[in-house]
Amino acid sequence: MHLRLISWFFIILNFMEYIGSQNASRGRRQRRMHPNVSQGCQGGCATCSDYNGCLSCKPKLFFVLERIGMKQIGVCLSSCPSGYYGTRYPDINKCTKCKADCDTCFNKNFCTKCKSGFYLHLGKCLDNCPEGLEANNHTMECVSIVHCEASEWSPWSPCTKKGKTCGFKRGTETRVREIIQHPSAKGNLCPPTSEARKCTVQRKKCPKGERGRKGRERKRKKPNKEESKDAIPDNKGLEPSRETPEQRENKQQQKKRKVQDKQQKSVSVSTVH
């Protein structure tokens, strides 16, 4: 009798546990399927589902759909990720994807950074920059063409020749200018920064230490008057140079001719008397 009562007690207890577990699982399924229930939602979701993720977000958060394979999952973020722009509505804050050629954007019509191979100009991404602009490959933007700018010419330098300013008549003078703005890739090239031209000066003697090389050489070549007198050879007191046999024979013949001429003159005088 006691054994029969105990067995019935365990049967009834197991049946009650089974009914309770069924009611609990039914309640969990109902809560997951109900769209207004937020129990168990993670990451700032106000409402969610196991299959689609977040369905709505808490205040100030942005709702964005992320693609995972063939499936899109709702996510709530404090700011929109790169490639999306945020728009706030009364009932939801939403992230929308930028255009295909845009990396980051302010809204659907204004890009702030283009993807590789495109140049940014006035909020749009272009393959080539418009006329009058050039592409900056560093910033990937269309920028204005910059031409070279140079300063005014300096005054002409003193007339010089081989670094000297005296001791000559013709020399060279120069002037220079500086580059203020270097050109961009398509800008006009810079002009020459120096010029030189021939010049003439009034002849003037150089101070000591500035005389040119030619002037010093000329001074060395000009002898003094006393030195020139001393340089004249004095033949007095010099021994006569030795004569060659031919010179002696010529002198003897000249003497004979003179003697013969005198004899002829004397004979002619005697015949006249």
Swiss-Prot record:
Q: Which UniProt key words apply to this protein?
A: Disulfide bond, Glycoprotein, Heparin-binding, Repeat, Secreted, Sensory transduction, Signal, Wnt signaling pathway
- One GO CC annotation: extracellular space
Q: Which domain of life is it from?
A: Eukaryota
SMART domains attached to this UniProt entry: FU (SM00261), TSP1 (SM00209)
The UniProt entry's GO biological process terms, in alphabetical order, are: blood vessel remodeling; branching involved in labyrinthine layer morphogenesis; canonical Wnt signaling pathway; limb development; positive regulation of canonical Wnt signaling pathway; positive regulation of non-canonical Wnt signaling pathway; positive regulation of Wnt signaling pathway; sprouting angiogenesis
Xref: CDD domains? FU
Quick one: where's region Disordered?
201-273
> InterPro entries per the record?
Furin_repeat (IPR006212), Growth_fac_rcpt_cys_sf (IPR009030), R-spondin (IPR051514), Rspo_Fu-CRD_dom (IPR043601), TSP1_rpt (IPR000884), TSP1_rpt_sf (IPR036383), TSP1_spondin_dom (IPR044004)
| Ranges for the FU repeats | 35-86, 92-135
**Compartment(s) where it occurs, according to its Swiss-Prot or TrEMBL record:** Secreted
| A single MF term (Gene Ontology) | heparin binding
- Residue ranges of the TSP type-1 domain? 147-207
One matching Pfam family: Furin-like_2
- According to the record, the signal peptide region is 1-21
Compositional bias of kind Basic residues = 213-223
Query: Which residues are glycosylated according to the annotation?
Result: N36
Q: What does this protein do?
A: Activator of the canonical Wnt signaling pathway by acting as a ligand for LGR4-6 receptors, which acts as a key regulator of angiogenesis. Upon binding to LGR4-6 (LGR4, LGR5 or LGR6), LGR4-6 associate with phosphorylated LRP6 and frizzled receptors that are activated by extracellular Wnt receptors, triggering the canonical Wnt signaling pathway to increase expression of target genes. Also regulates the canonical Wnt/beta-catenin-dependent pathway and non-canonical Wnt signaling by acting as an inhibitor of ZNRF3, an important regulator of the Wnt signaling pathway.
**Family under the similarity heading:** Belongs to the R-spondin family.
Q: How does it assemble?
A: Interacts with the extracellular domain of FZD8 and LRP6. It however does not form a ternary complex with FZD8 and LRP6. Interacts with WNT1. Binds heparin. Interacts with LGR4, LGR5 and LGR6.
What is the UniProt domain comment for this protein? The FU repeats are required for activation and stabilization of beta-catenin.
Q: What is this protein called?
A: R-spondin-3
